[in-house]
Amino acid sequence: EVEYYKYLQFKFDEQWSKLKTYANSKGIQIIGDIPIYVALDSADAWANPGLFQLDEENIPTAVAGVPPDGFSATGQLWGNPLYRWEVHRNTGYQWWITRMWYCFELYDVVRIDHFRGFDEYFSIPYGSETAASGHWEKGPGIELFRAVEQALGKREIIAEDLGYMSDTVRKLVRDYLYDYATPEEQLYKSMIALVLRSAAATCIIPMQDWTIPPASTNLLRLVKTGDGV
């Protein structure tokens, strides 16, 4: 069974490489998204249980999420296993270096989801019904990204700033993505706006309800392809 899934990954990689090469030949860069966490049943957790907060039976001791806020009164319980950051530190962040290296094999630019989790991450006891019982823990911070940069060189990274962004998170963004002397206003000139995210409906949904015919018609014509969207 493992060999079967390895073969599927091989075929996907083969086809994706052809697609990326073609896109790049047309002057198109591909932006890829990397989630900060992996799933409990992922190949990463299966092959490297010691890098995650798992017990002797590979059951999580704490899981990921975010605290209660204006979006949810009980917070968000994602359920992903958390990292043992001290183990990652002791190995020179090699797993993360390899992960980022492969991302840049797939994409030209990498967007890191939940970037604030590298500064502080929310830890929720395993088995909790909501995220309300969780607490903040300190993440690896700039140390991780310095290790990645030393191994891979300076790469193009987009840091997601969704959710509560503390001063320490903003400092982490400035320290890694920009030189220390970069003016604050230059930071915001380099921002990228996305029309949607994973928890939102696609942008076509509100467009279908627009009542201004010219704007609605022109934009819908632009984003539609054939009979689909």
Protein language model regions, located:
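Alpha-amylase-like alpha-glycosidases and glucanotransferases acting on alpha-linked glucans and related
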Residues: E1-D13, V38-V229
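Conserved, well-ordered alpha-helix/loop/beta-strand core segments that scaffold catalytic motifs
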Residues: F10-Y37
